[in-house]
From Swiss-Prot:
GO molecular-function terms, A-Z: aspartic-type endopeptidase activity
GO cellular component entries: extracellular region
Family of this protein: Belongs to the peptidase A1 family.
Protein name, per record: Pregnancy-associated glycoprotein 50C
Note: On the 2D-gel the determined pI of this protein is: 5.7, its MW is: 50 kDa.
Disulfide bonds: none
Species for this entry: Bison bonasus (European bison)
Keywords, sorted A to Z: Aspartyl protease, Glycoprotein, Hydrolase, Protease, Secreted
Residues that carry a glycan: 9
Localization per record: Secreted, Extracellular space
Tissue expr: Chorionic epithelium (trophectoderm) and placental cotyledons.
GO biological process: proteolysis
EC number: 3.4.23.-
Length: 12
């Protein structure tokens, strides 16, 4: 899944 954190994209 992809999570948006402070404008950064984290793909986990």
């Amino acid at each position: 899944s992809q999570i948006s954190l402070r404008g950064s994209n984290l793909t986990i």
